[in-house]
Amino acid sequence: MAAAQARAVVEAVTRAHPGRVIISTSGQIVDQPGSPLQAPADSPIMTLIDGVTDSGVPTAVVAPRLYLENLLLPVVLGPVREEGVLRYPLPASFPVSWSSHLDVAEVVARLLTDASPTTGTVGVGHLPGLTGPDLAAAFSNHLGREVRFEGITPEAFGELITPLFGPAAAPVVELYRALNAQDGNTIAEDGSAQELLGLRPRSIGQWLEDLAVS
């Protein structure tokens, strides 16, 4: 989303004044002030969140971290199937509050339909965070054969995805460079969908089953 688009949405919400608004960050981090991962105050996503919140419309911000669907990229899933290796640009011990688009959809649906609007940020994802070996074990159980995790560098991942994404691969590489400089990428328990809405993300095994990954 560009800054102009964010401002246009803010203007539309201010004029229409709907009963409630739900914003998804799509993985951008907006709830860790002071962290190097926090979206800048003048970024489009923060412009959108601040503007809509200031409009007076009850606003909830759905804040996932990394999407499980990233693991379905051909350059990731292919080696899982062919070599029994799950390669991803994070250290093996790096915990992540992974979630799927299905999990996010369930949270958004609840926020839109609850009798009383929930406001503020709602983190979506696994707690405690899952590591690379946790993901590999889930793939092993689902596929019925051994899968091991192998951390690769952001640069190596960039070489894999550039044929798919072209220039759009560059910011992905930068994201994983930034993540590699941290100890993890997890949501806060007190602001999680588990705590606020009683909604837990599906297990990795259930997600693989739901999407019929083979």
Predicted features, each with a name:
Residues 1-7:
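Glycine-rich anion/phosphate-binding loops
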Residues 11-20, 27-148, 159-160, 164:
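Oxidoreductase cofactor-interface core, primarily capturing Rossmann-like NAD(P)-dependent enzymes
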